[in-house]
Amino acid sequence: ATGSPAPDCVESFQSWRYTDVRNGCSDAVTVVVQYE
């Protein structure tokens, strides 16, 4: 993955099926993960 780290209020975690991202910020935040 490339780019700057997501803000602390954005939590990401991996389950056995998929990677889930939860936005805990008061403002909308777009998180983009690129696999190369």
UniProtKB/Swiss-Prot annotation:
Disulfide bonds join 9-25. Keywords: Alpha-amylase inhibitor, Disulfide bond. GO terms for molecular function: alpha-amylase inhibitor activity. InterPro entries: A-amylase_inhib, A-amylase_inhib_sf. This is Alpha-amylase inhibitor AI-3688. Pfam families: A_amylase_inhib. This protein is an effective inhibitor of pancreatic alpha-amylase. It is 5 times less effective against human salivary amylase. Inhibits mammalian alpha-amylases specifically but has no action on plant and microbial alpha-amylases.
